[in-house]
A protein has these predicted regions:
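Intrinsic-disorder/low-complexity linker and hinge segments
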Residues: 187-195
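Generic protein-terminus/edge-of-domain signal
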Residues: 1-74, 80-81, 89, 115, ...
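Regular secondary-structure segments
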Residues: 54, 126, 143-154, 201, ...
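Basic/polar phosphate-binding segments, predominantly the helix-turn-helix DNA-binding elements
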Residues: 174-180, 199-249, 259-261, 265-296
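An amphipathic alpha-helical interaction segment
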Residues: 120-188
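Ligand-binding loop in jelly-roll beta-barrel domains
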Residues: 80-104, 110-113
Length: 299
């Protein structure tokens, strides 16, 4: 299953369902060229995530870190960290995602398993992410298990839920056996940059349909305009203005696909001052006009 455009709330938290309460895991393959902007923009979720590149080359950004992954390599992204994925090649770039809530492997609330082997790792500010490579035995083992999980999830043979559970437990054991953290120095808090970015994202998502001033954004995190721009560009790898454009374009997609509103109405509804400017930016970002996109995606 492809998740084309990730739904996020005003705090940049992803609102896509990652499985169900009884079985809190979702496995899917992302084809970046099928996303309207050609990449997966910044978001975060409570679930931990394993990714395995199945085609092409992909840049993964996690907080201030950037990883370039080739086909066959993977990445672990911890709970609650902002992340983004961009293709490096013009042709098909894809990766398998495994998202699961760690309650799934925690036995029960208050258990030794949860207290000793799960919570210290997902709450740690020492582990935001790490790359999985084929030439490291324990990492290669996790990559094999990602492939196995993908197969189990879609074949759905007898006992597949149980087999998925066992495989996840084994993957988690690989991690805690090889990634060492100083539990005495463990801090639950994320970096100040991470928290400030979430405040900026929240402000943009609450106000994208209106005119947004840089001064207002800077005031939300108590920095001057220059410091605010520098922080954003350093971490998000684009300007605040560019991000706002991308967010407005993404928000307009639902209107194009699911309403009969005119292009002008959609432009104004999503914060563009004129329909011509909306069409110009839309074509620049997607290589097609809003009308062409609507015709291709009529329900």
């Amino acid at each position: 299953m492809q998740i084309y455009n990730i739904k996020i709330d005003e705090n940049k938290k992803e609102t896509t369902n990652h499985g169900v309460y009884e079985f809190p895991i979702q496995i899917y393959e992302t084809f970046l060229e099928k996303n309207v902007l050609g990449f997966v923009n910044w978001h975060w979720h409570e679930e931990v995530q394993f990714c395995l590149v199945t085609n092409g080359r992909v840049d993964f950004y996690v907080s201030e870190n950037k990883y370039t992954l080739d086909k066959g390599q993977g990445i672990f992204i911890n709970s609650g960290y902002l992340h983004m994925a961009k293709p490096l090649e013009k042709e098909s770039n894809s990766y398998i995602c495994i998202d699961f809530n760690t309650k799934f492997i925690s036995s029960f609330q208050g258990s030794i398993i949860k207290q000793k082997y799960v919570d210290p790792y997902i709450q740690s500010n020492q582990i935001s992410s790490f790359v999985l490579k084929n030439d490291v035995n324990w990492q290669d083992s996790i990559l094999d298990k990602i492939r196995k999980l993908n197969r189990l999830y879609y074949e759905k043979n007898d006992l597949y839920e149980f087999d998925i559970y066992i495989t996840l437990i084994s993957m988690w054991r690989d991690i805690i056996s090889n990634i060492k953290i100083n539990k005495e120095k463990n801090e639950v808090v994320k970096s100040s940059d991470e928290n400030r970015l979430k405040v900026i994202f929240s402000y943009i998502h609450e106000n994208y349909m209106n005119k947004i001033n840089l001064e207002d954004i800077a005031n939300t995190i108590h920095l001057n305009k220059s410091e605010c721009c520098h922080l954003f560009k350093r971490n998000v790898k684009c300007t605040i203005f560019e991000y706002i454009q991308d967010y407005r374009i993404n928000k307009s997609i639902d209107f194009l696909k699911n309403t009969n509103m005119s292009i002008s109405e959609i432009a104004y509804e999503n914060g563009f001052c004129t329909s011509s400017y909306y069409c110009e930016i839309f074509k620049k970002k997607t290589n097609m006009t809003p009308k062409e996109y609507r015709n291709l995606n009529k329900k």
